Amino acid sequence: MNLKNTWYAGFVLVLLQACTSSDAYLEQGRALLKEGKTREAIAALNQAVEADEENAEALNTRGVAYFEQKEYSNAQLDYDQAIQVAPNFYRPYYNRALLKIAQSDLEGALKDYSDAIRLVPDTARSASSDLYLNRGQLFATQSQVQPAITDFTKAIELNPKNALALYNRGNLYFNQKNLPAALADFQKSVEADPAFGKAFYGLGLAQLLNNQRDAACLSLKQAKQLGYADAVNAVAQYCQ
């Protein structure tokens, strides 16, 4: 009995050491990835996976590193494996959706975004906002305007400072000739991100259509100053 207990305690100790070692390599890999040292990150993450084959975080992060290297088949394998060992972990679905977009598999990406949205914790509001933003952009590229607006609206509810969601919804409203709604979204977008030249450009065009020439020229000149190329011609045409 004592021998069995000793063996069990030793097994638990080895298991804990393996998990600790895997997590240490994972953190090392993440740090290297943030520094742009992708190859070194993959080497560290290889060790994390060798120490614990079911470390879904390590598999997902290595998938991201492979994706950055454009090694799409390896990224796919890691995301698939992460989902297999942790099917309720939203991040591999999120990242696999990005991979599928790069591979022009839009239907597959849409499904993965939807799964990630279903699984993302309520506490992860920023990540959830980005998921709705990305799925909304996918709907928009497929000319599914109302689903796109619905997703952008949800993204904004989760993060009122999501400048890209505000811009995208404003752009759809602009195309629908809903000028008041477009103006409001473009204005909030530039307030959320004062360096967002494209949003200043959209705001300027909406202001022009709303007979606010002085305000429009200020917005267009700001877009030009921020380096948004289309603003150059707009300033020359409307603000001289």
Residue ranges of model-derived segments:
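Hydrophobic helical h-region of N-terminal Sec-dependent signal peptides
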Residues: 11-13
